[in-house]
């Protein structure tokens, strides 16, 4: 691993290339690419996990704005709106897995609002290997089901309060099934790489998990609980730590919704990386409060989420 490794996760809010005839949208898109690239370069980030990339072209445009030697890997599994996850890095990148199916060993029998059984995540997750020195870094990024509710037939409004309650329950069930699918995938990957009961490959899971650090859908991604990170135990090989718990209290949020800060963008890491963490921050200075309506956001350059960024001391490559 490099002497210092800087990892960022950022929901860049509907980064879609404009239609050829929409000059206003083209100007906004160009300004947004300039803003995104400037902030990424300014932080010195080595690896950036992105959510709400609107197309392969959007990822390529951001890669071009960053310039050499940046590389990109993009998920092949967007949601119905076309948004997907991607990873950009200024080190060699290798795609390792596109994660989509809800596995039999997870929660394979979860219903959706129309009474069908879910078989896959709404937006595919992505696993890459970053060749950043030493054994490198395994990174997974995901964008779990949002709190936005939908109802039978695609309606955005309930017919009654019972249906509203069911809609909220279905959204939570989907997010839970997606989180379990990620954890099942991680269980296998982490266990296979373990060395002497410790992580054999530094691993990060990051992205927009659409709930807070204490929500069960976030906590279950950590794996077995840990009483003391400084004392090795049998759970170390598969455990992740939510680094957001070490954010400065005044900046422990990544989005402002109706005036309230909430931390829904997370970086989880294996024990070796937790012990090598130097700083973590949420770059909240530019974001503003948003509401339920998205119409006013169409011409906005600054995304509604703040990037969360972690800096690691990479000089120690072996687990403690």
Where are the language model's segments positioned?
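A solvent-exposed, charged loop/short amphipathic helix patch at secondary-structure junctions
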Residues: 18-31, 147-173
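Structured beta-strand-rich core segments of catalytic domains in phosphoester-bond hydrolases
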Residues: 47, 52-147
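Metal-dependent phosphoester-hydrolase catalytic domains
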Residues: 94-99, 119-121, 129, 184-204, ...
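A shared catalytic/ligand-binding motif for oxyanion handling
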Residues: 47, 52, 77-78, 84-85, ...
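Beta-strand-turn-beta hairpins that frame and shape the catalytic cleft
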Residues: 1-7, 121-163, 317-318
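Active-site flanking residues adjacent to catalytic metal/cofactor-binding acidic residues
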Residues: 10, 51, 142, 207-208
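Short catalytic/ligand-binding loop motif for oxyanion handling, primarily in non-cytosolic enzymes
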Residues: 16-18, 56-58, 82, 147-150, ...
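N-terminal, active-site-proximal structural segment of metallo-dependent hydrolase catalytic domains
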Residues: 1-84, 158-159, 179-180, 197-202, ...
């Amino acid at each position: 691993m490099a002497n210092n490794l800087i990892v960022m996760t950022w929901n860049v809010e509907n980064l879609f290339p404009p239609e050829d005839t929409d000059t206003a949208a083209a100007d906004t898109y160009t300004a947004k690419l300039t803003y995104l690239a400037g902030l990424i370069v300014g932080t010195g980030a080595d690896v950036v996990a992105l959510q709400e990339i609107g197309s392969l072209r959007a990822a390529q445009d951001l890669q071009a704005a960053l310039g050499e030697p940046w590389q990109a890997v993009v998920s092949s599994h967007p949601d119905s709106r076309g948004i997907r996850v991607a990873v950009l890095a200024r080190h060699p990148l290798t795609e390792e897995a596109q994660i989509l199916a809800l596995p039999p060993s997870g929660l394979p029998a979860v219903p959706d609002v129309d009474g069908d059984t879910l078989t896959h995540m709404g937006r595919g997750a992505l696993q890459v290997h970053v060749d950043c020195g030493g054994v490198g870094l395994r990174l997974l990024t995901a964008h779990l089901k949002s709190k936005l509710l939908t109802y039978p037939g695609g309606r955005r409004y309930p017919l009654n309060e019972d249906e509203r309650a069911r809609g909220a329950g279905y959204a939570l069930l989907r997010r839970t099934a997606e989180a379990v699918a990620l954890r099942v995938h991680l269980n296998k990957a982490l266990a296979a790489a373990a060395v002497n009961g410790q992580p054999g490959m530094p691993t990060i899971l990051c992205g927009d998990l659409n709930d807070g650090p204490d929500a069960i859908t976030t906590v279950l991604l950590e794996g077995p609980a840990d009483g003391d990170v400084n004392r090795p135990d049998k759970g170390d090989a598969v455990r992740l730590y939510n680094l957001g718990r070490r954010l400065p209290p005044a900046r422990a949020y990544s989005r402002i919704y109706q005036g309230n800060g909430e931390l829904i963008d997370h970086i989880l890491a294996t024990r070796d990386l937790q012990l090598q963490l130097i700083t973590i921050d949420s770059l909240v200075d530019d974001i503003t409060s948003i509401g339920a309506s998205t119409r006013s956001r169409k011409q906005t350059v600054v995304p509604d989420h703040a990037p969360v960024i972690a800096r690691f001391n990479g000089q120690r490559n072996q687990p403690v």
